[in-house]
Amino acid sequence: MVQKSLLFSLLASTALGALTKRYSFPLPESQGSETFSEPYEVAAGETFDGGMKTYGRGVECTGQVEGGEDDTVFIVQEGGTLKNAIIGTDQIEGVYCLGSCTIENVWWEKVCEDALSLKEGDGIYTISGGGAQGAEDKVIQHNTGGEVIIDGFEVYDFGKLYRSCGTCGDIQRKVSVSNVVAVSGSQLVGINENFGDTATIDSSVCATDVNDICATYNGTDGDEEPEEVSTGPSDYCIYTEPIAECA
């Protein structure tokens, strides 16, 4: 029995090693670094171009302990754009959007609690290019209303790429996913069918070693945790199986 357990462990570690060797997270080369003593605010309608520097807060990640606005690296106000930046490992909360925002070519070296939290507004939130790795749970957390567009994002070693808040009450949300590369994750998308959420996943998406492409839940108003209802294509999870493996 011990020998059999050791064999299974060896096979699992060998498979993981082979996957890691084959798929390497394409984090861009940093052009320098800056450490903020407080969140950097991108004003409404303004653009912050990070010049591909690495930005952090000089603190240790606290894992899945819920942080707050004061713990973020960037806060993006309504209509703001954050582009060409790397979020370093020395942070608790990555980026908050307090209204419709554009996140363009932003990379997370290692996600702490969440990478990107959409906190306020009900417009369009666009995530274009960029990527994230090492998320124990969620990469993109959608708390408010509106529509999220995720295009050209790369996500490795993650819990969920996108999750519409399951404990924020009856708010309808939409998400569309295209040209995404997903490797080694639990769930690409999670939405609340009882709130009328929909997820549209384009055939340009590839996924390797991802357990579920899309799952639906019954969301709550915060008094209890949401329960998973189903996985796979449905009236709420709109896509065609099979999703291609990443080349």
Swiss-Prot record:
<keyword id="KW-0106">Calcium</keyword>
<keyword id="KW-0732">Signal</keyword>
<dbReference type="InterPro" id="IPR012334">
    <property type="entry name" value="Pectin_lyas_fold"/>
</dbReference>
<keyword id="KW-0964">Secreted</keyword>
<feature type="glycosylation site" description="N-linked (GlcNAc...) asparagine">
    <location>
        <position position="218"/>
    </location>
</feature>
<keyword id="KW-0456">Lyase</keyword>
<dbReference type="InterPro" id="IPR004898">
    <property type="entry name" value="Pectate_lyase_PlyH/PlyE-like"/>
</dbReference>
<dbReference type="GO" id="GO:0005576">
    <property type="term" value="C:extracellular region"/>
</dbReference>
<feature type="signal peptide">
    <location>
        <begin position="1"/>
        <end position="17"/>
    </location>
</feature>
<keyword id="KW-0624">Polysaccharide degradation</keyword>
<dbReference type="GO" id="GO:0045490">
    <property type="term" value="P:pectin catabolic process"/>
</dbReference>
<dbReference type="GO" id="GO:0071555">
    <property type="term" value="P:cell wall organization"/>
</dbReference>
<protein>
    <recommendedName>
        <fullName>Probable pectate lyase G</fullName>
        <ecNumber>4.2.2.2</ecNumber>
    </recommendedName>
</protein>
<dbReference type="Pfam" id="PF03211">
    <property type="entry name" value="Pectate_lyase"/>
</dbReference>
<keyword id="KW-0325">Glycoprotein</keyword>
<dbReference type="InterPro" id="IPR011050">
    <property type="entry name" value="Pectin_lyase_fold/virulence"/>
</dbReference>
<keyword id="KW-0961">Cell wall biogenesis/degradation</keyword>
<comment type="similarity">
    <text>Belongs to the polysaccharide lyase 3 family.</text>
</comment>
<dbReference type="GO" id="GO:0030570">
    <property type="term" value="F:pectate lyase activity"/>
</dbReference>
<keyword id="KW-0119">Carbohydrate metabolism</keyword>
<comment type="function">
    <text>Pectinolytic enzyme consist of four classes of enzymes: pectin lyase, polygalacturonase, pectin methylesterase and rhamnogalacturonase. Among pectinolytic enzymes, pectin lyase is the most important in depolymerization of pectin, since it cleaves internal glycosidic bonds of highly methylated pectins. Favors pectate, the anion, over pectin, the methyl ester.</text>
</comment>
